[in-house]
Amino acid sequence: MRSRSGSGVRLDRILFMVEQTICSHQNPITALFANQKDFPGHAWVRDNVYIAQALWALYRAYMKCADFDEDLTKAKELGFTCVKMMQSILECLMRQAEKVELFKKYQRPLDALHSKFAVGTKGTVCGDADWGHLQMDAISLYLLTLAQITASGLQVVRNFDEVAFIQNLVYYIETGYRTPDYGVWERGDKTNQGIRELNASSIGMVKAALQALNDVGDLFVDGSRGSVVHVLPDEIEQCSAVLSSMLPRESFSKETDAALLGIISYPAFCVEDPELVSQTRETITQRLLGKYGCRRFMRDGYKTVLEDASRLYYNKSELQQFEDIECEWPIFLCYLILDAMYSKDDDAVEAYWRQLESVLVLSDKGFRLVPELYVVLKEHVSAEKAHPGTQDRVPGGATPFLWAQSLYVIICLLYEGFLLPAELDPLSRRLSVYEKRPPCEVQVTVLAESLDVQRELRAHDIHVQCVDEIDPVFTILPASALGQLLAKIGESKKLNLSGRPLDRPIGLLSTSRLYQIGNKFVIFTPQFMDSRRSHLMYDIRILTDEWSSELQYIYASWNSVSISGRPLVVLVITQGMLSTEGLSHFSNIHLNRHMKSTVIGAIKKINTGYLSGARVVMKDLSDFFRTTAVSKMEFRDKSAEDTLRSVAAEKVQFTLLTEDATEAKNEKITTPRGPRTLRRGESVKDRSAYTAVHKASMRHRSIALDSNDADLMKLRLAYKSRPRDLQDMDSTYQSPPPTQTPLGLVKEHSSGELRQQLLKTTRRGAENETTHRDLTAEQMNEMKADDLLDLVNETTVLEEQISIVHCLWMKFGPDYDTELGCQHITVRMLMEEVHTKACEAREWALVRLTAGLLKKQLEELSKAVTHLLVRQKQITVGIASKKEEVITCPKTNEELEKIMNRAYGDDANSFTLAQEIIVYLGSLVRTEPKLFLEMFRLRIGLIIQVLASELSRLRNISGAEAAETLLTVSPFELKSMIFSLLSGRLLEEYAEDGIHYSDTIRETRTGIGSFRRQIEERKSLRKSTRSVGGLEIPKEEDEDEEADEDDFQFGIWLRHRRIDGALNRVPNGFYAILWDTVHKMPHGVKINDTVLHWGLTQEMTRKEIKFALESEEALNRIAEPEYRELVVETLWLLGRLEKLVLLEQPNIPRDRPLDVDHILHVANQIFVDHNKHLETIVMECCASSNPNNTRCDGARNICKHFYDSAPAGEYGTSHYIIRALMQLYS
């Protein structure tokens, strides 16, 4: 008889260890495992999947190293056991199919699949609300393992019902990048309060599962197309973007977490950036690694001797007591060994192996067991806290801990050479971090909607095919049609499962490939090309800007989602994009010509081969057939051709309807908005009646920024320029027409001039209002519905029509039946019609008013909110510091509608304007994330105020006029202004021709951010501009100072501070430094009557996002953004002056909080006294000894010239703040 080889004996020894330490816990009927003494009979999905991985690894080792037939028998037995386990877990999940259907639609925690089941029955073991079941990582880990096992040749999925369920699990997890869950540790945030969070470890596992299922092909392992699972690449890319913004942080409450080891290495391998992988690994080893393993996260009280086991929740103040005595988990040494093996770091493998060997526990039979954790004994707590890492610990929890024991089996197989790391990764996921493919060129096909469009493009030397001219094998449909097709994939009548929810957006990457459906190849146009999605698409410049940014996005993202073939984007040019006449009787012909040139210019740029840094190729559709990515769609129980025909019959129209087309359509009636009922005539003849109607309408049109708004007064940007005669200015100035760009006229004015002009406008408005109020109110009360309807039938002027319909809306309500033309025509139908007219005419003020009254929600809003939130940018809507609604987690369209109604219920214009701004911010945070690096909360109300304030400064107009002008700005110009503010550029420097994004954003941060740049010190220029009795007092200056004076612009730093304050921008690392400051102050820090207590540092760690949000909450109570920014500068300097704080006896207040406002006022007084000594321009306001001179109008009694000082330099604000701090500490 042939003896066994040495390797065979060692492999048998590992198998025997598995049988004795792992398989002894297995239920013989269900093949599931239970391992928790506190929960007997409970089988956790996560634990069982890792056990399946260990059995699968042992199966592969025996298949590879078999000496005899009996070894193959052992291999088959291990393979069958592994498959049975995976099938049992699948059966447990399929018994809750109704939960999958509900969760797809609503993402409610109580609809989540359970995370543990009964070992013996595969049923549930607790109620929906009795456990933190929503664990995206557990379901994703199962799908990832299923894909890897299937790729190795073992078949787990047995029938098409199971395939449909797996497809629905994909729909279940694909929103994981925006779904807060309870995380790997099942208890939510670290206070154990049951608060769900976005967890990086969950998002990483979701991404890995989606990629693996996308790569595995068919689930039957036989090449059958019907068992293919479809994954949308956009969801993978969303996960990548969120991970990049979160790592090495785990969540809001956890700076980092050892669970991240599972996503940067085995088993997920979901992070492609090697620098980010290295940074995450180093963060974990530096902060969490100890002698016995890693702590799960900082201040983790689980199973420590100080934890009160009778309470599930912790008190916030007790978290600090767990610091330095957190339990250490040996399982993470296994993860570190696996990571070192896959990264081929032999030294690290040996070091971690020796460390792991030292913490293993020997069983009675001599087997090495991995305990769950190591605990500090109660008598050693004080010593451990005094000298972390010096005290011995004892094993705690389950021994062996099956999750850890399974990983130990895997590393034993790898360490002893039975398997290579690649053999546990048949999908080659590990290579993504090492193999970098260059960006893939984007293929673009431009098609003309009609022959007329084709001829017009040809006249500009652009040769494209018409839609009707493409090869019959191709079919072109809008993105919404793809959504309908996906809704049919995954359907199962037996399981009562539908396909993908129709309300989920279709991403750009998904529409950038060909789909083979039967004998047809279908191309879907991008979703932003679907017409009539919102009024934004009527601004063609927004559409062409979308072309640029989205093509750049495809160029940068395509290779990261592992799709074979190149992307293809089809753009359909419609008549509405080029026509200079006929869109509407109200159209702005000049604007239409500009639109036409914009579209043609964009196409010519695409044809050059480069667009915004992206490599693009423009050809006919048939030329790209062989190189384009193709995905095949098949439908169970249905003909592919029949399915395609049913969807194509419902397809959305591409074109923006012309007036004639709209008229023809309405003759046939009935559109959702009703028939066109406003007859053609002339202007209203009864001007007196119309005046009353118009004034009533105008009183309800203003946004929250009118001339009496205190916040706008505070936001007024004061500039000092050449003296001007106020009367002349008032008599000669004329407000520019609303259609002119807000960036056109640049004028400068002083604070006093602006305030006097603002007050004059207010007085004139008040006088006019008083004169006409009684008459207008009386006329309106006497008017009946028939009177207003007679007026609306007389006019063809859009402004007049909207004013009259607006009054009908306010007086009789939207559902009032006007009975126009003896038909059922409600006021809402009339409003829908004038809204469409306003869109066609590109009258943006009227568009926003009518859209707000109709409560129209932009389709892009929900997606934009999600883009911001998953990148940790919270949003507030409403009037700043008065009535703000905070959005902290992704919302459904219905929830967003309620929030917007609460915030802007009576303000139709702001209702629309705020949505537009959120959409633009959501677009920019995706394409230009560096613009948002220093922000945690975006306050839409303050952004609106700053935009209006900038327009007031640029055009030298009043607050009311600035608010009106802001409403007339086109969507593209509004996006340009927001981009300009975010990038720190001056609006007057900004060209209106386009948004020119750069591949890398220069660091042009303003305000306190300038401390990161070298700022040249220079003497105060205020000396040379001080006047006495109207005469300039010359000062002796050298030539360099005179040159500086020419360049100096008064008001520039005041403006920067207001913009930074409005955007909530802070320096990098600001909140960590603030944490240090609060931690050193016994009674905390007082900001604007709000105290950041010392106890916050006991509850939250230094770099915890929750602390940043608490601090942000205090700062946001400051109404004046420029004062907020000075407070930020003071706190920043206070935290940086470590030598002062570390004095032996610093004069820190021991009986009260440190008052930041007091420090600022002391610094201001030092500034005033210093400038009084220097006899600068401050002598004319705050430093004046003349009782007739009043103090300046700076916020919070701080001199406006102090606000207008640079942060650094001999005469900068930091100089005076430091002197004030010296007085405090000395």
UniProtKB/Swiss-Prot annotation:
Protein name per its UniProtKB record: Probable phosphorylase b kinase regulatory subunit alpha
Pfam family, one: Glyco_hydro_15
Single GO MF annotation: calmodulin binding
Organism: Caenorhabditis elegans
Keyword presence, Kinase: no
Stretches for region Disordered: 666-688
Annotated Gene3D superfamilies: 1.50.10.10
Biased composition (Basic and acidic residues): 679-688
Spans traversing the lipid bilayer: none
Pathway this chain belongs to: Glycan biosynthesis; glycogen metabolism
